Amino acid sequence: MQKEPMSKYGYEKLEKELEHLKKVERPKVVEEIDIARSHGDLKENAEYHAAREKQAFIEGKIAELGDLISRAQIIDPASYEHDSVKFGSCVVVEDLESEKQSTYTIVGVNEGNLEKGYISINSPIARAMLGKKEGDDFKVRLPKGESEFEIISIEYKALEF
């Protein structure tokens, strides 16, 4: 079973979402099914079928979140050195072709936020950077094709969600 690294915030966010699905959304959809069922013939009852689809989606999401929580590995990136790229590292990279610099912070799968530069540890660019040090080059296949980057700096900055 593969562990999923995440911050304490990411773990708590998953737990809250799971609790909301179980205590609010699940009972709500069961009630919708009961109401639709009371309207009679289930074969041609669009409300009933829509509610059943919604129920299947909610149950799938509950199972997915439960699995993710069971595999969670809560990591405090402030507790270790960032001499190479790791979970929680804030990394400045330069595209060697365009010379454009970008800053990324490596976070858990459910914590990504491109506006803040937070990228999932499972993203192609994060996977390509892991273990690299300042001055190292790496290549990554992106939708626009293969790009080559250089790591300019690595540090730890507290995450702001």
Curated annotation (Swiss-Prot):
One of its GO terms (molecular function) is RNA polymerase binding. Keywords: Coiled coil, DNA-binding, Transcription, Transcription regulation. The keyword Zinc does not apply. Residues 45-65 form a coiled coil. It comes from the Bacteria. It holds the Pfam family GreA_GreB_N. InterPro entries: GreA/GreB_C_sf, TF_GreA/GreB_CS, Tscrpt_elong_fac_GreA, Tscrpt_elong_fac_GreA/B, Tscrpt_elong_fac_GreA/B_C, Tscrpt_elong_fac_GreA/B_fam, Tscrpt_elong_fac_GreA/B_N, Tscrpt_elong_fac_GreA/B_N_sf. SUPFAM superfamilies: FKBP-like (SSF54534), GreA transcript cleavage protein, N-terminal domain (SSF46557). GO terms for biological process: DNA-templated transcription elongation; regulation of DNA-templated transcription elongation. Necessary for efficient RNA polymerase transcription elongation past template-encoded arresting sites. The arresting sites in DNA have the property of trapping a certain fraction of elongating RNA polymerases that pass through, resulting in locked ternary complexes. Cleavage of the nascent transcript by cleavage factors such as GreA or GreB allows the resumption of elongation from the new 3'terminus. GreA releases sequences of 2 to 3 nucleotides. NCBIfam families: greA (TIGR01462), PRK00226.1-2 (NF001261), PRK00226.1-4 (NF001263), PRK00226.1-5 (NF001264). Belongs to the GreA/GreB family. This is Transcription elongation factor GreA. It comes from Campylobacter lari (strain RM2100 / D67 / ATCC BAA-1060). The gene is greA.
